[in-house]
């Protein structure tokens, strides 16, 4: 008898040996021992409190910035969905969003409420949970500029609230990536007042720019590498000759050379292998280290 046969009772869905590829934008990767789709915050807390504490746990959103290796993932992967996708305008230019809310939806809801400053989220793939954890941003704006507080749940199912100061934000990084793993439940953001139509016009400009410069309809994980100090990753990849160059079923997009894409039949090994080959080549040619922005999890196949 294993821990998988002794799972706590849950109101949400428990899926055993479930393929993770359909849960990610790359559409690759092996199975998780267990995928848990909690019904709501209480269901998640009760499950974690009843789960064997030795079992690894991690949470995902829509899998937009995630590469799951072909051998799959040990433990429980928690997919946050309907019970975590509420948005509520709080007044005083503040808005609260659940961790499963798509970034673009938060931008639209903020615009409808006349809250400016969150427009950039319309250009960020993924959900609020991931945005808060990695200080997501684009076109000169970042999460640190607008988030005020975050509620998280730890592995023991205990909830606490953190201020933006507690998060110690830097470029594409927060304190949530260090130390004890936690699950983001929701966050409160603050913008500035403006007319909804003016906000929506700025969002439309971001959307148009993104559609002409990024392969948003491909199987991609968004930006592959962080920008090194003083450099643009896309330019380093491009100048090293990797734009549009096939590597198994993987390629750096001809449209944007910092976007790794699955051209149809890629494995996770193709995608990660290409990324590592490019990192090594760029380092050899320029002396500049490229660091992954995409999160890679699981076992090699």
From Swiss-Prot:
Keywords: Cell cycle, Cell division, Cell shape, Cell wall biogenesis/degradation, Cytoplasm, FAD, Flavoprotein, NADP, Oxidoreductase, Peptidoglycan synthesis. It is found in: Cytoplasm. InterPro entries: FAD-bd_PCMH, FAD-bd_PCMH-like_sf, FAD-bd_PCMH_sub1, FAD-bd_PCMH_sub2, MurB, MurB_C, MurB_C_sf, Oxid_FAD_bind_N. The keyword GTP-binding does not apply. The active site is at 172, 223 (proton donor), 293. The keyword Nucleus does not apply. PROSITE patterns: FAD_PCMH. Residues 27-194 form the FAD-binding PCMH-type domain. Its EC number is 1.3.1.98. Pathway: Cell wall biogenesis; peptidoglycan biosynthesis. GO terms for cellular component: cytosol. It catalyses: UDP-N-acetyl-alpha-D-muramate + NADP(+) = UDP-N-acetyl-3-O-(1-carboxyvinyl)-alpha-D-glucosamine + NADPH + H(+). GO terms for molecular function: FAD binding; UDP-N-acetylmuramate dehydrogenase activity. It is an enzyme of class 1 (oxidoreductase). Its cofactor is FAD. PANTHER family: UDP-N-ACETYLENOLPYRUVOYLGLUCOSAMINE REDUCTASE (PTHR21071:SF4). Cell wall formation. Belongs to the MurB family. NCBIfam families: murB (TIGR00179), PRK13905.1 (NF010480). This is UDP-N-acetylenolpyruvoylglucosamine reductase. It comes from Caulobacter vibrioides (strain NA1000 / CB15N) (Caulobacter crescentus).
